[in-house]
Amino acid sequence: MSSIETLVEEIGKLTLTEASELVKALEEKFGVSAAPAVMAGAVMAAPAGEAAAAEEKTEFDVVLKSAGANKINVIKVVRAITGLGLKEAKDMVDGAPKTVKEAVSKDEAEKIAKELKDAGAEVELN
């Protein structure tokens, strides 16, 4: 196995928290950002088609705004939705606001939001 393949395998074994820490460390070491670059043409075209884009939105992000009073139930639901371990799910809930799911269909986003709200969480769809 080449060193790159070995590195990819090792990175694949990291937990979500460890991967996040790795990204932060790389950003600091090399002075870069993991945020996607925005193209100038896309920025220029956005204001003109913004109203149409809002109506045609097909993918939504489910954002956990706060856990509310029943944090344990919210952690259980976050674990079920994301497949995270107990510690990672607890860290996500404690660190709210956090994105629970990204780029899901409207139906799935509403279903996830309902599950979280039923558990006592405050949720937002973006």
Swiss-Prot record:
Pfam (any one): Ribosomal_L12_N
Domain of life: Bacteria
An annotated Gene Ontology molecular function: mRNA binding
InterPro entries in the record: Ribosomal_bL12, Ribosomal_bL12_C, Ribosomal_bL12_C/ClpS-like, Ribosomal_bL12_oligo, Ribosomal_bL12_oligo_N_sf
GO biological process, one term: translation
Keywords, sorted A to Z: Ribonucleoprotein, Ribosomal protein
Cellular component, GO, one term: cytosolic large ribosomal subunit
CDD domains: Ribosomal_L7_L12
The protein's role, per its UniProt record: Forms part of the ribosomal stalk which helps the ribosome interact with GTP-bound translation factors. Is thus essential for accurate translation.
Family named by the database record: Belongs to the bacterial ribosomal protein bL12 family.
Quaternary structure note: Homodimer. Part of the ribosomal stalk of the 50S ribosomal subunit. Forms a multimeric L10(L12)X complex, where L10 forms an elongated spine to which 2 to 4 L12 dimers bind in a sequential fashion. Binds GTP-bound translation factors.
Protein known as: Large ribosomal subunit protein bL12
Protein's organism: Chlorobaculum tepidum (strain ATCC 49652 / DSM 12025 / NBRC 103806 / TLS) (Chlorobium tepidum)
Gene: rplL
